[in-house]
Regions:
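N-terminal "domain-start" segment that seeds a small globular fold
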Residues: 1-12
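CheY-like receiver
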Residues: 12-13, 62-66, 98
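Short active-site neighborhood of thiol/selenol oxidoreductases, capturing the structured segment around
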Residues: 15-27
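The canonical Cys-X-X-Cys-His
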Residues: 29-32, 74
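Typically the conserved alpha-helix immediately C-terminal to a functionally engaged Cys/Sec
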Residues: 33-46
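Structural micro-motif
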Residues: 66-75
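Non-catalytic, surface beta->alpha helical segment in thiol-disulfide oxidoreductase systems
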Residues: 75-102
Length: 102
């Protein structure tokens, strides 16, 4: 389950997060919808990871801060800091490998 963030609250949510993934998306992006499903499966693997989402078009400040120009863009958050970023679609196995590498 995703927690929807916006330009006013994303910094506090990231800083308070021990383990998380943030998805920057666009509402009409089919790859973003697929990535949501991938992240749901990823979180179901018992990773204990919080899931966040931010609409790039509605939250330009957050998107600009993280240079999230393409959708979907994934941020890995560990101990309140962004430790990795990747744009594009991944499958659950690739997502797990990416998360572990960050």
């Amino acid at each position: 389950m995703f927690t929807q963030l916006d330009d006013t609250g994303y910094k506090a949510a990231i800083e308070a997060c021990e383990a998380g993934v943030a998805l920057f998306y666009k509402k009409l992006c089919p790859h973003c919808k697929n990535m949501e499903k991938v992240l749901d499966k990823f979180s179901g693997l018992g990773t204990g990871v919080s899931l966040f989402s931010l609409d790039i078009e509605e939250n330009p400040a957050a998107a600009q801060e993280f240079s999230a120009e393409r959708a979907p863009t994934i941020l890995v958050v560990k101990n309140g800091k962004v430790t990795g970023q990747k744009a594009g679609l991944m499958n659950p196995k690739e997502m797990l490998a990416f998360y572990k590498s960050c």
